[in-house]
UniProtKB/Swiss-Prot annotation:
Role this protein plays: Assembles around the rod to form the L-ring and probably protects the motor/basal body from shearing forces during rotation.
Family indicated by similarity: Belongs to the FlgI family.
Superkingdom field: Bacteria
The keyword Signal belongs to this UniProt entry's keyword annotation: yes
UniProt xrefs under Pfam families: FlgI
Location relative to the cell: Periplasm; Bacterial flagellum basal body
First and last residue of the signal peptide: 1-24
Major place of residence: periplasm
Name this protein carries in UniProt: Flagellar P-ring protein
Organism field: Geobacter sulfurreducens (strain ATCC 51573 / DSM 12127 / PCA)
Amino acid sequence: MDKPMKRIFVVLVILLVLPQLALAIRIKDIASFDGVRDNQLIGYGLIVGLNGTGDSDQTKFPVQSLANVLERMGITVNRDDIKVKNVAAVMVTAELPPFSKQGTRVDVLVSSLGDAKSLAGGTLLMTPLKGADGQVYAVAQGGLLTNSFSYGGQAATAQKNHPTAGRIPNGALVERELPNVLADRSQLRLNLHQPDFTTATRIARAVNEQFKAGVASCNDPGSVVISLPDAYQGRVVEFVADMERLEVRPDNPAKVVLNERTGTIVIGENVRIDTVAVSHGNLTLLIKETPRVSQPQPLSRTGETVVVPRTGIKVSEESGGLAVLREGASIGDVVRALNALGVTPRDLIGILQAIKAAGAMQAELSVI
């Protein structure tokens, strides 16, 4: 074999192998360990410093909250004298990542509770954030970013984006650490993001081949149980790091997702169509009202001006083509055939539903 032929052969081999390699995905991208997850935090707080866009006097709880804050600072005020136009009551939420340490910071989201018009330019006062167990895990405080505005008067209002919600980057300080769920464990459970029998089996096989032992087993399609190998005893973190880097090829089910509100269509790679004929045509009905005014003759003593209705109706029907999709047709074949009929995305939604109803689509059809 001469050099040019060798080069061509090598290029062909690479082109054939690359698609298979591209399908391989790291285990850490399709699964996570049991217990290693974010935890939701929530708290109630006050935003101050608003330019007259806070809660109105009709909202009572901001007044009570502000009075309580002032009393804790040693300031006694009459609640009837408090005006809250520059103050807004808000709910503060955050996600506490796993293994967060004391002193680290997380982002917080702030949303108005009352009838405030805008939170732009406000500052969140110190707000404890609690978990589902009622314990305080973080404290939030800082200036709010809304990337919006809202200005108006009695007759007009100008608004950009959503001014009654915003975020504080790194606005919460972690005060309590979560327990280390991986410490002193001899067995780990890996939970798949998309449960699948084939994918779970491939993960277990890849782990067993890498560590030369039967340490991984599947009990169900959603998880893989892994025992810590003897060589990694006392080194759980190192074992997890080595295992997460392993690559497997997930097996995705054939699925078609339709969104009728937006006309969005997502078709999976494994979708197959049996032999079916598809015809498409549009019927357009146009009704137009063009009333005319009928007036009496000039200088006439009889008669009156009346409006005479006139209705025009136009019916047009586009000639529909007929496309035949052969058995085993792939998604590319389906798209090319339907494009040849000149269908729009919204028309395609109805066509795919009809193909599924005819029993010719070997895939799950999900409408959202």
